[in-house]
Amino acid sequence: MSNPFPAHFLWGGAIAANQVEGAYLTDGKGLSTSDLQPQGIFGEIVTRQPGDSGIKDVAIDFYHRYPQDIALFAEMGFTCLRISIAWTRIFPQGDEAEPNEAGLAFYDRLFDELAKYGIQPLVTLSHYEMPYGLVEKHGGWGNRLTIDCFERYARTVFARYRHKVKRWLTFNEINMSLHAPFTGVGLPPDSDKAAIYQAIHHQLVASARAVKACHDMIPDAQIGNMLLGAMLYPLTSKPEDVMESLHQNREWLFFGDVQVRGAYPGYMHRYFREQGITLNITAQDKQDLKATVDFISFSYYMTGCVTTDEAQLEKTRGNILNMVPNPYLESSEWGWQIDPLGLRYLLNFLYDRYQKPLFIVENGLGAKDKIEENGDIYDDYRIRYLNDHLVQVGEAIDDGVEVLGYTCWGPIDLVSASKAEMSKRYGFIYVDRDDAGHGSLERRRKKSFYWYQSVIASHGKTLTR
């Protein structure tokens, strides 16, 4: 069997500033929305007081240990590392006229370290960590002013790193703003849909402005969007279930439609009309939105099912995406259903819809790891999960889908986004820290470290099909 992965395919991992860096007030950094949710994106929003602490304040101390960690990534053979720039390191309050030089200098050092090993950076401009100053003073993305603040930030980092970064993403999992409005757009969790969609509109305009700025300032760079790829199957072949899956998938595909096609799709006009939502969209907004992305990136962890059956729906109360379990799939320790074939399906679906290159920028298994008496960590469950998903990526490439690369989520253990846990481990590299923040922060290679090293070295030929 021929190897489907093209020669230019990028292999690596993905991390986010607020989940790895720590140093949460170091070198002039301001408070972010992430700092006000020390228990994760679905946790309570708290006011930070001097002397209090959250696990993300130190995280895995990547801010100080990045040379060691990047050396480990290089040992695995990474050709790409997805990171995010903490907006609050560059503009601590979000609305300053001038950037924070100490923050800019940190990422210069980080990119130089990656370049030393030939690892290409893939940089997310905003990954669940907008400046809290913009929320407190201006109402977050509910205020049109935030568009200008984001554009200033984007132009600042484009100018600074134009020779070091050639692939960019605007907003991480932008469609999650519907379900986690404080994390996504800086609005209170109980905000009504009209307010959330208006904030999302401002975010979409800001994303498009960043795309245009990138194209103007770094002509040889590419910039993409980033979606949470949550494909929802109909639970049954009942036509009502099939139609419901169409409606619910459009809830997140809407973001891609705007960012790829440059205008609001017709089905959203109907939705807004029926919901009584009137957005403030200016003629300039419509013009700005025409700046479309070069490629589509997405996270993929699971699929789900949807139904119109009220008895089945009752089981989903409190489920953020109103998914019902798929009876044909197994689940992880955290209840996330495992569906490798769903990744091939999603890749084909998105490519058929948009005809744009795709980049899988998050995929991984959160699990509890055990250190054996000899110090080894035998995470065969993680190897099996990643192997099966990568096999399906290869199948999608054989199907004719253009896939730029694969950066698995959490190549090193980090603080989980949803509940700020260390025990939910994704990494090939173990970090000695627990949910209470105790531990030496020592790094240790897991069995999966050597497995991924082999996969990359063979360009996917060692995958078990």
Curated annotation (Swiss-Prot):
Disulphide-bridged cysteine pairs: none
Pfam families the UniProt entry points to: Glyco_hydro_1
EC annotation from Swiss-Prot or TrEMBL: 3.2.1.86
Gene Ontology molecular function: 6-phospho-beta-glucosidase activity
Enzyme class at the top of the EC tree: hydrolase
Catalytic activity of the protein: 6-phospho-beta-D-glucosyl-(1->4)-D-glucose + H2O = D-glucose 6-phosphate + D-glucose
InterPro entries the UniProt entry points to: Glyco_hydro_1, Glyco_hydro_1_AS, Glyco_hydro_1_N_CS, Glycoside_hydrolase_SF
Alphabetic keyword roster: Glycosidase, Hydrolase
This protein's pathway: Carbohydrate metabolism; beta-glucoside metabolism
Protein's GO biological process: carbohydrate catabolic process
A single cellular component GO annotation: cytosol
Positions annotated as active site in the UniProt record: 173 (proton donor), 362 (nucleophile)
Xref: SUPFAM superfamilies: (Trans)glycosidases
Family: Belongs to the glycosyl hydrolase 1 family.
Protein name, entry field: 6-phospho-beta-glucosidase
Organism of derivation: Dickeya chrysanthemi
